[in-house]
Each structure stands twice: as C-alpha cells, then as structure tokens.
Amino acid sequence: MSDKTNDDKTLSVNTKKTLTMKRPGVEQSTVRQNFSHGRTKAVVVETKKRKFSRPDEKPEVEAAAPKPAAPAPAAPAPAASTPAPAQAAQPAQAAPVVRAPAPATPAPKPAAPAAPVTKPHVAQQRPAQQRPGGQQAQRPRPSDRSGMVLNTLSRSEMDARRRALEEAQVREVEERARAVEEAKRRAEEDARRAKEREESARRQAEEEARLKAEADARRKAEEEAAKRMPQPEARTERRDDARPAPQGNRPQQAGRPQGNRPPQGGRPQQGGPRPAAPSLADAAPIPGKPLPQSQLRKTVASDDDDRRGGGLTAARRGAPAKPEVRAPKVVKTEDDRRRGKLTISSNLEDEGRSRSLSAMRRRQEKFKRSQMQETREKISREVTIPETITLQELAQRMTERSVDIIKYLMKQGQMMKPGDVIDADMAQLIAEEFGHTVKRVAESDVEEGIFGVADNEAALVSRPPVVTIMGHVDHGKTSLLDAIRHANVVSGEAGGITQHIGAYQVEQNGQKITFIDTPGHAAFTAMRARGAQATDIAILVVAADDSVMPQTIESINHAKAAGVPIIVAINKIDKPAADPQKVRTALLQHDVFVESMGGEVLDVEVSAKNKLNLDKLLEAILLQAEILDLKADPSRTAEGVVVEAQLDRGRGSVATVLVQTGTLHPGDILVAGSEWGRVRALVNDRGEHVKEAGPAMPVEVLGLQGTPQAGDRFAVVANEAKAREIAEYRQRLARDKAVARQSGARGSLEQMMNQLQVSGTKEFPLVIKGDVQGSIEAITNALDKLGTDEVRARIVHSGAGGITESDVSLAEASNAAIIGFNVRANKQARDAADQQGIEIRYYNIIYDLIDDVKAAMSGLLSPERRETFLGNAEILEVFNITKVGKVAGCRVTEGKVERGAGVRLIRDNVVIHEGKLKTLKRFKDEVSEVPAGQECGMAFENYDDIRAGDVIEAFRVEHVSRTL
C-alpha cells in the first residue's frame, strides 16, 4: 500500500520507492465488497504461504541479512541499513549473531521513513550483481505488483508510520539481545541435561549388571535342576530363549554389537550393516531443527516391534534374542516432571515425554512375572468380625480391595457400597470366600475378664461377715444398730424412719462385723432386695409387741431368695405387751423354725432401748460366720457392689460401695455400672480417710464421672481406655433398652392417638430430684403404683443432686412440677422457677410426698356422674299455645317434679327423648316443684312430639369428685 500527495508525488526517503511495511511470506490482494443501496468497499486480503523445509535444506538464517544493494545513480543518498522486519519474526528458530546496524545517512526530510526491505527468498541468495547487464533488475512498482489502489496519506498517518518503523527497530534490537540470552540459557540447560543423562546411564548400567547377575544365577540354578531332571530340559531351554530382552532406556552391554542385529525370519539385510546407535549425548535434538523423517520412521518402527513382541518372535524361530537398538529417549529431569502444565512451546519441543525409572522398573518386573507365570501367594489372615461392620472396614481387615468385595456381592445379586453396614454372618461368608479365617466377637466381650476371676487359693484369708438388718418399719432396726455402734442415727433421719441404706463396721472381741441397714417402708422393696443379695447373714428384727408384719414377710422372702442364713432378733422385750413366744409361733407359718422350736434358726431376745443381750446377738453373728467359713483374696484387684450413690455439692459423685474381694486403693480406675472414674479418696463410715479398703469393708468412693445406680457391681480395670469402653457400651445398652421400652409402650403415632381417644388417659408430669439414687428409685416405684387407667404419673426426669436451672427449663418445656426429696434448689433455679411460674415442692418424708402426689393426681380424675330419681308424671292432655308450642297437662303420680331437672319421655315403656324441662306451671304460676297427686303443665326444651298417655320421668344429675 502506498500513499500519494495531491501532485502525485510519493512521500518517501527515496522518491523511486514506496513507503510500505510488507510482511514476509504474505501475499496481498484486493477484494471488493458489495453492500446494499449500491455501496461498495475495497478490502485488502492477505494470504500467508506455508513453507515446508526439507532436512537437506539450510535454514534461512544465513540469508536473513543480505547486503544492501548499491545505490542507484539517480539516488545519491545510500539506502539506510535498516534491519528487515521479517528478520525479527524468526528469533526463536536460531540464535543469529547480533550485528550492529550501519549508521544511516540522515534523510533530508525528517518525516520521511526509511526504505522498506522485503524478505529474500531462497532463490535470492545469489548476489544481484551477477545478473546480466551488470545492473539491478528494476523492481516492479507496488501498484503494478499487487494491483492496490493508492491513497493519499495525511501527516498524522505518516507520523504513525514513522513511529511504527522506529518501534520495530527497537523491538528487533531487544529481540536479538533476548535471543543471545536464550541461546546461553539453552547451552547451560543442554549441559545440565547431558550430565543428568550420564548419571542416568550410569545407574542403568549398574541396574543392568545386577539384573544380569541375577539372570546368570537363575540360569545356573535351572541348569542344575535340569541336570537332575533330564526330561524337562528342552522346555527349560526354550523358555530361556523365549524370554525377551529387558526393555527401556538402558545402554547396550559391553561386548555386544549395537547395530549388527541378525535379520528376523531369514530375511536378507538391506543396506548392509546398520550403523551403531548414536549415544545419548549425540541423540539430543538440535534446537530449532526437526528430527529427520528417516529417524522418526525408525523410532516408530522399533516401538511397533516392541509392542508386537519381536523378541518373542525371534526366539520362537530359533534365532537368539538380542536387545534391540532403540532410539534413545531424553530422560526427564525433576524440574520437567514437576512441570505438568501443557503449553504450546513445551508441546512443540523435540524432547519427547518418557516414563520415569520407577515406572520402567515396575513394567519390567510385571512383564517378567507374566513370562515366568509367577503368581503372588495368597496370604490367609485371621479376621476379627464384630456384630456389625462396614464393607470398607472388612476389606481393610482382610487387606483386600473393597472393589473385589463389591464385585463378589454383585455376582451374588446384591448391590452394595463400601460404606454399607453388614451383619456378622454376611461378613463371615465374605471372609471365608476370600480364604481367611474368622474370629467372631461381640460388643459384650468388652466385659469379659472383669468379674468372676478365680481367687488364688493360697492367698485366701478370713474376712469379716456382712450382716443385713431387715424387718418391718418401726420395729427398731436402726435403733438396734445404733445401740451396737454406740451412735445415734435415728435422730438424723426425717420422721424417725430410715430412708437410706447405710453400711457400717463394728468390732467385737477383736473381730470386725459389717452391718448394712435397710429401710423397712413398703416403698423400699428394692433396697431390701439389694441388701439381701450383698450380704452373708440376715438379721430379722421383729417387735415383740407387734409380731410378724407385711414387710417382715417380705424380708423373709428376700433372705430366702438370696440364700443367706437368718438370725431372728426379737426386739422391744422391755415393753409390757411383749410376747416373744407369739413371734416364734407366727414365724412358723413362714417356714422360719427357731432353735427353741426345734429348728436351726438362731433367735435372740434383745432390747435396743435398754441395750439388753446385744453381746449375745454379736456372738450369734460370729458363730454363724465361723460356720460359713468366709474367706477372700486381698491381693487381687477389687470387686464389689454399690450400696448407695449420691451427688454431693462439694464432693461430686459419691458412691457407698462394699468391697467383696480384693483391696481397693486410691488411684485405682473403677467401673461401676455405666460410670467410671479414678478413685480420688476413700472415706469410711466414721468420716475418716483410709489408704485402702479390704474385703467386706464399706467405704465411700470419690472421683466417679457420674452417679451410678444403687446395686450396680463395680470392678477395678487396668487402664482408662478399658474403663471408658466398658462404660460406653453399658450406656449404649441402657439407652437402647429405654428406647425399646418407650417405643413398645407408645407404639406408633397413630396408635398413641387412638389409645388417647379410646382410653382418655391423663398424665401428671413430674421432675424428681433426690439426695441418693435409692430414694429416687423408691419414689419412682411408689408413684408408678398410684397410676390407674385414667391418670398416671409420668416421670420426665429423675436424678440425684440439687435442683438446677436445667431442671427448671425441662419442667417448663414439659409443663411438669418439680419435687425435691432432701435437696434444695439453688438461687438461679429459684429465680428461673419464679419467672416461669414453675412450682417446686420440697419433701423429706416419703409418706408426705406420695400423699401430695396422690391428691394432685386425684384432681385429674373426671368427676363421677350420679343420677337421683325424683318422680313420674302422666300426660293427660296436650295443649297448643301460641308462641310457646305444645304444653303437656300432667298429673304427678310418684315422687315430685322439680323445675330444671332432667326428664325422660317414655312411650310404651321406651325412652324416646331425654332432656330438660323448660317450664313448670301450676295453673298460671311458675313453681319450683310439684308434689305427687297434683296437676301441672310442662314444656320441654326443643322438643314438641308429646302425646296423651306418655310418662315423664324426672331425675337429678350430680357430679362427685373422685380420689385415687
């Protein structure tokens, strides 16, 4: 493209040359576009020619900078030695030498740019001076060559062209400098890669030598085996010959020709002996020069031969297998491996992608195993299978892939995922199918070895007897124990009755006796049962003036169920109405035969108030213990039973335990029921801290994580992990039982709604907090017995300890009342209860608690409907009165009729209507009642179908409140 002035003179340095910027290898042409309304536009279209270079061609770097032509006579100013823009387009193909541009003669006009220089073709390498005539060929005009339309350039366009040429010159200088730096960097990179190739070749040579030594040793062993077994010798040799040569980028072994591979299949060699394979250093590709097509064809052919197993083919045909000559591959360095981004520049590089050494080694080992028919030996393991297990965990325990297990299940017709849970039976089938042995375990196995450990017979020593005092309420059990202990426990009990189970230890004639005091109230049945189970001897206290009572009979049954001997203590013999012989006779009805009546049960007449015959009672206890021959092993870990448990504000969870065997020390890790903890302190019945608790010794244990249930067994375990595992298992078991019990009682939502509609049962929600677990259990059992078909008490929450804010929140959510038994609420709980309107009631006697709850539950009962007969009246005549309706003229035949009473209309001895009287008149006056023998007028509410001869029955309905 060129521009002209108005006088058709070209603006350029040389008046004979047009100012152009022609791109090398690009042809330009003009295309005219047609638009609507007869408009047209000429568009310049550039066509880029692709030049394909042959391997024997020289690159165009040598002809990149031709000498400038001699100036023409008509133009004395020499052409500026401006570098061609086309030369800047190929800096990456080669590293040309940077030539300093010749100083150009300043142009007479500052706005005139330098003369354009076009890229010479390959045929233009000959100097222009050799053309015939000794003159340069006249260049065709641009307009003649391309047929473009010449337009006039403005001054701004000429300035833009000039600035573009100057920027092109600056860019060319910068690109040449960058090319020099790139060439230097590539040289350093090539040197580093060559060093790495040498190191890799050295390692491969060492690996080849090691493999060769192993192959020689294996071959010698096979030859020796073949000598001993002559028959399979031929097969062994054929297998050795058929084994392929190692593959990969390994250097050729010394002593072997690298290029003289014998022809396969008897084919003659073409082209004589093949040249030796180039070394790794020589095989490095030249930057900017593509790999020759012949070398590419050889490389591809060798790869195809490897894939087709050419070594095996040659071995089968009888030719000795020799390693093939493969085109060396460039080993990737660590930086190249880490550079995972695929770019155009990296993809166009001649360095091919190659496998790592580890991948090649694994590939060779796998190929060798496949050739030698070596299979990995199946390892059979003992797999521990719990009750439930996931497929993923089962696969890990068998060291199998979960995919293989899923495939096996799919063959069996079951679609499962690795996270699915299966039972122990299915897991056992899968493990046995995969060749493993199975060991079945259950969650309850965590408790194995805790209880029932056999004692060492040589370490057994005598232990004190454990005695439980049982009997009816107010028969003097606690008073008798106080007299023995020289203490006063009765004064500390609310209401003078025992509501806790207590354990004490006394000493008589140098021998210790452990006493367990149980409540006698009917609500404490479970306490008496626990006391009988944890004892050796049961003392049955019977008042001489009261004889045998219901709780006395219950205590006898508990002792017989526990299988413990009974000693009868006939108390209160100091009273005038005492009759010990009556007590002995009454005990005969319950199979208790005392010695004085010809039986084997010891009986002692005592008086706790006057302390009479207490020594005889203790002697009887020691005699019975001597007969039982009680022994225990104090050197083993401690086991026992929880007598009582409570939550103390200052000390936390406190459990009163009875050590049955072993010795308990501070610091031992204890598991009691679903709670565990480390023993922080041991306190005896006198409040003293002790260093150990031996067999048959009651102590208070501090340090448990929670409050256990009374009656739970405890044991000492080895570590905290074992204790935590046992406690979690028991908590989960208790939670599952509670859920099953609730779901079984409630059923589904529809069943619950139907049950409520049919039965109409009302609930009285309660939150119960007590001082000890035994009292809470007794209160819960007593409240359950109060329930009927219409109303029952629902225990929302129960626990040992004081009343807290969480209890108030729970009571608010469930609309329940809070009951505190021997506990109080803290200030925050009281404030929250006042704010929310929650009632808190405190009790210290179980009688009062049960009576109040019973009265409150009675208020929920629907009142009883009572019907009282008043009288009958006969309808004599029916009158129709305006604005009133039908009025019956009646005579009272029996009793009386009251206004507002309920009435029934009887016709032919059938009740056809039941309602109320609207009006009752005698003559024209309203009256309250009409006695028998008098006449009156009656009208019914919302009913007019009355006839003469019908009978009206009057009655009164009363609602009477009920109690439980």
Swiss-Prot record:
Q: Keywords assigned by UniProt?
A: Cytoplasm, GTP-binding, Initiation factor, Nucleotide-binding, Protein biosynthesis
The Basic and acidic residues compositionally biased stretches are: 1-10, 156-227, 234-243, 323-338
Q: Where is this region: G1?
A: 471-478
Q: Where in the cell is it found?
A: Cytoplasm
Polar residues compositional bias: what residue ranges? 27-37
* G4, as annotated region: 571-574
The record ties this protein, via Pfam families, to:
EF-G_D2, GTP_EFTU, GTP_EFTU_D2, IF-2, IF2_assoc, IF2_N
Residues annotated as domain tr-type G:
462-629
General function of this protein: One of the essential components for the initiation of protein synthesis. Protects formylmethionyl-tRNA from spontaneous hydrolysis and promotes its binding to the 30S ribosomal subunits. Also involved in the hydrolysis of GTP during the formation of the 70S ribosomal complex.
Q: What is this protein's record name?
A: Translation initiation factor IF-2
Query: Which gene holds the coding sequence for this protein?
Result: infB
